[in-house]
Amino acid sequence: METATLVTIFLSGLLVSFTGYALYTAFGQPSQQLRDPFEEHGD
């Protein structure tokens, strides 16, 4: 395979992995540990 093809596949996989991890952190199991500053502000 050509170098450009391998770099493109690597960067695409990296982007998909990062997006999946961000969604898991935002909406998955670890999201229960995130604090909500709007709920802390008792107004």
From Swiss-Prot:
Keywords: Chloroplast, Membrane, Plastid, Thylakoid, Transmembrane, Transmembrane helix. The chain crosses the membrane at residues 7-29. Its main location: plastid. It comes from the Eukaryota. HAMAP family: PSII_PsbN. Belongs to the PsbN family. This is Protein PsbN. The lineage of its organism: Eukaryota, Viridiplantae, Streptophyta, Embryophyta, Tracheophyta. The gene is psbN.
